[in-house]
Amino acid sequence: MQSQKIRIRLKAFDYRLIDKSALEIVETAKRTGAVVKGPVPLPTRIERFDVLRSPHVNKTSRDQFEIRTHLRLMDIMDPTDKTVDALMKLDLPAGVDVEIKL
């Protein structure tokens, strides 16, 4: 008999939001009797952009911007019906992208 597993992947630009959301998910799952593995921090994806400061000349003068995408991964082993219902009702911040695989 194969056990069920819910894999949750969180993605956000702000690490404080993603850590707070991961903590809420872990507490909710443990309160309903499920076993949680994680949250596992995945490598942060850094996108860098170089933009010319001047609209006409001075190509050597540039501004550099970056966007950091933080990722967390967690597995919920043997979830009960109460666990799934509690996770569906959970209200997470708007800046966190949640991806769930069964």
Curated annotation (Swiss-Prot):
**Which Gene3D superfamilies does the record cross-reference, listed alphabetically?**
Ribosomal protein S10 domain
Output one GO MF annotation.
Answer: tRNA binding
Entry keyword annotation includes Cell membrane? no
- Alphabetically list the UniProt keywords: Ribonucleoprotein, Ribosomal protein
GO CC, any one term: ribosome
Q: Which Pfam families match?
A: Ribosomal_S10
Q: Which SMART domains match?
A: Ribosomal_S10 (SM01403)
Spell out the InterPro entries in the cross-references.
Answer: Ribosomal_uS10, Ribosomal_uS10_CS, Ribosomal_uS10_dom, Ribosomal_uS10_dom_sf
Biological process (GO) annotations held by this record are:
translation
Matches recorded under PANTHER family: 30S RIBOSOMAL PROTEIN S10 FAMILY MEMBER (PTHR11700)
Family of this protein: Belongs to the universal ribosomal protein uS10 family.
Q: How does it assemble?
A: Part of the 30S ribosomal subunit.
**Purpose of the protein:** Involved in the binding of tRNA to the ribosomes.
Q: What is this protein called?
A: Small ribosomal subunit protein uS10
